[in-house]
């Protein structure tokens, strides 16, 4: 797939991003990425066995045990601001 100025402008609009640096450099980088993905698509993987886990026989299961935990309190203790059981963050949407 050839990436040109027109396609880059369309991608910029669709992604709601603004590319302000050297556009030629950006086009070259995107072209390299697309070419690499196209090479990956050329690989014949039909003869390969599907791998769900790297551990033979799958991951060992563990028994679910009910334990008392203060994870919420421990996490909130690290927060700069908290209120009851919630993080307090600056308002970003008006």
UniProtKB/Swiss-Prot annotation:
Lineage summary: Bacteria, Pseudomonadati, Campylobacterota, Epsilonproteobacteria, Campylobacterales
Gene3D superfamilies in the record: Glu-tRNAGln amidotransferase C subunit, N-terminal domain (1.10.20.60)
Record-stated family: Belongs to the GatC family.
Protein's gene: gatC
GO molecular function: asparaginyl-tRNA synthase (glutamine-hydrolyzing) activity; ATP binding; glutaminyl-tRNA synthase (glutamine-hydrolyzing) activity
GO biological process: glutaminyl-tRNAGln biosynthesis via transamidation; regulation of translational fidelity; translation
Residues of the signal peptide: none
InterPro entries (alphabetical): Asp/Glu-ADT_sf_sub_c, GatC
Subunit structure: Heterotrimer of A, B and C subunits.
Record field: catalytic activity: L-glutamyl-tRNA(Gln) + L-glutamine + ATP + H2O = L-glutaminyl-tRNA(Gln) + L-glutamate + ADP + phosphate + H(+); L-aspartyl-tRNA(Asn) + L-glutamine + ATP + H2O = L-asparaginyl-tRNA(Asn) + L-glutamate + ADP + phosphate + 2 H(+)
Name assigned to this protein: Glutamyl-tRNA(Gln) amidotransferase subunit C
Role noted for this protein: Allows the formation of correctly charged Asn-tRNA(Asn) or Gln-tRNA(Gln) through the transamidation of misacylated Asp-tRNA(Asn) or Glu-tRNA(Gln) in organisms which lack either or both of asparaginyl-tRNA or glutaminyl-tRNA synthetases. The reaction takes place in the presence of glutamine and ATP through an activated phospho-Asp-tRNA(Asn) or phospho-Glu-tRNA(Gln).
HAMAP family (UniProt xref): GatC
Class of this enzyme: ligase
Keyword terms, alphabetized: ATP-binding, Ligase, Nucleotide-binding, Protein biosynthesis
EC number: 6.3.5.-
